[in-house]
Amino acid sequence: GLVGSEMCIRDRHCFDTDGHMFFEVTEDGKPLRKRRYVFSEGFAAIAMAEYALATGEKEYAKKALDIFKRTLHFLNAPGFLEPKYLPTLPSRGHSITMILINTASRIRMVIDDPSLTEQIDTSIAALRKYFIHPEFKALLEMVGPDGEFIDTCNGRVINPGHCIETAWFIMEEAKYRNWDKDLLQLALQILDWSWEWGWDKEFGGIINFRDCRNLPVQDYSQDMKFWWPQTEAIIATLYAYQATGDEKYLQMHQQVSYWAYAHFPDKEYGEWYGYLHRDGTVA
C-alpha cells in the first residue's frame, strides 16, 4: 500500500551513508539539507513503530529499534553531532531529553529491549536533576552541563508547550508503571507550573515563550499561538484528569480545547491554521 511505499522511499532516500538522516529531500529523493539534530531519527523510529503496530510487520519494529540505538550512538559519539554552541557556552537542552522518552515508549509497544526503559529512566532523571528549577517554578529549555541557570535570553527561556508535552510523556510512563506515584507527581508539577506560565489570561491559548525572570523574550514569535502547544495541552490535561479525577484538569482541558477549536480551524475547509497572533487572529 501507499504507507508501505512511503516507508521504502524513506529507507532508500532519507539516510546518508553515515546513517544520519537528511532533514529535507526533493520529491524524487535527492538530499537537500542535513542538520545537526537527531529529531528526524526520533520521528522516523516512532513512525516505523506505529507502522509495525498497525500492520504486524515486525521488520519495522526492528528498524525502529535500530534507528533508536543508532541515535543514542550519535548523541554519545564525541564530535559526531555539531554542538549548538561552541565550547564558550557548554550547555544541555531539554528538547532531545524529552523526545527520547516518547520515542522509546512508542518503540517499546512493538519490541522489547532493555535500552528503551533505560533511556526513559535516564531522561526522566536528567529532567529532575538539571532542567527543573523550583526557584522559577519552571522547567527550563537550556541549562549548564550540571543544570546551572544560564542568565541570558536563551538560558531564561520557558517553552510552555514543550514542558506540557514533557508532562504527558511522563504521565504516559506513570500509567505504564501502574500509575507510579512519583512519576505522576513529577508530571503534574510540570503541568501545573507550565500551564501557569503558558496560559494567556488575557486572550486565551498557550503562548509560545516566556522568560523565567519576566524579562522581554528575544524570539520574535514569543507572544504568538502555534498549533502544537494547544494540542499538547489538550492531551496533557486529559491525561491528568484520567490519572487524578481532579475536576481542575477537566476544566483546563475544556478551556484549551474550546479555545483551540474556536480559533485554529479554517471555517471553510476545516484544516487548522498553523500560527495565530496573540489575540487569536490568523498570522
What positions do the PLM features span?
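Internal, well-ordered domain-core segments that constitute the primary functional module
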Residues: 35-82, 91-93
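Well-ordered mid-protein domain cores that form the structural environment of catalytic cofactors
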Residues: 11-53
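Solvent-exposed loop and edge beta-strand segments that line ligand/cofactor-binding
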Residues: 1, 27-41, 84-97, 103, ...
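CBM-like carbohydrate-recognition segments
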Residues: 16-22, 197-209, 218-234, 238, ...
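Short, small-residue-biased leader/transition segments that mark boundaries at the very start
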Residues: 2-9
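Well-ordered alpha-helical scaffold segments within catalytic/enzyme domains
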Residues: 1, 43-57, 101-114, 165-179, ...
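Extended ligand-binding clefts on enzyme/binding-domain cores
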Residues: 79-80, 93-209, 251
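Amphipathic alpha-helical segments of tetratricopeptide repeats
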Residues: 12, 53, 69-73, 128-129, ...
